[in-house]
Amino acid sequence: MKVIIASQNPAKIAAVESAFNLAFPNDTFSFEGVSVKSGVPDQPMSCEETKQGAINRVNNAKIKLPNCDYYVGLEAGIEGNSTFAWMIIDNGLTVGESRSSSLPLPPQVIDEVKKGKELGDVMDEQFNTDNIKQKGGAIGLLTNNLLTRTSVYQQALILALIPFLHPTRF
């Protein structure tokens, strides 16, 4: 089965691959990351805006690569003093969705993001890292790598897969 991931971010791709392989151990998948627009600002600043970005990514991936088995959109955002991400999974018949855990952000990080900077760039500046958003993310930095962007996204993706695990109930 072909799974299209509406991102080329390695951390997001790894999370999707892991979630699908754990949820469906007897199935064989091929995964492809594609670059598509989210239709929202680079740094979404509300739950609604973030969810819409994930939905838009799925819809744009379906246009770019039609006739695949699953489309997955992941969009990270900020609301208040926390960051989180929305997961949308669509197979053309069913849509599964879930929001990740929320990660509190330090006040100085929030201040910079409110000035229009992307969270990943702010984290790189303040923690002297390089391209953290494609690695462990802010989650990895702030939890001392007890959790990573991939591990938290994997959990949310598994939750979004529930309607596909139990199709007769949804």
Curated annotation (Swiss-Prot):
Binds 1 divalent metal cation per subunit; can use either Mg(2+) or Mn(2+). Homodimer. NCBIfam families: inosine/xanthosine triphosphatase, PRK05074.1. GO terms for biological process: nucleotide metabolic process; thiamine metabolic process. This is Inosine/xanthosine triphosphatase. Its EC number is 3.6.1.73. Keywords: Hydrolase, Magnesium, Manganese, Metal-binding, Nucleotide metabolism, Nucleotide-binding. It comes from the Bacteria. The keyword Nucleotide-binding applies. It is an enzyme of class 3 (hydrolase). It catalyses: XTP + H2O = XDP + phosphate + H(+); ITP + H2O = IDP + phosphate + H(+). Its cofactor is Mg(2+); Mn(2+). Belongs to the YjjX NTPase family. The lineage of its organism: Bacteria, Pseudomonadati, Pseudomonadota, Gammaproteobacteria, Vibrionales. It holds the Pfam family NTPase_I-T. One of its GO terms (molecular function) is metal ion binding. PANTHER family: NON-CANONICAL PURINE NTP PHOSPHATASE_PRRC1 DOMAIN-CONTAINING PROTEIN, PTHR34699. InterPro entries: ITPase-like_fam, Non_canon_purine_NTPase, NTPase/PRRC1, YjjX_NTPase. Phosphatase that hydrolyzes non-canonical purine nucleotides such as XTP and ITP to their respective diphosphate derivatives. Probably excludes non-canonical purines from DNA/RNA precursor pool, thus preventing their incorporation into DNA/RNA and avoiding chromosomal lesions.
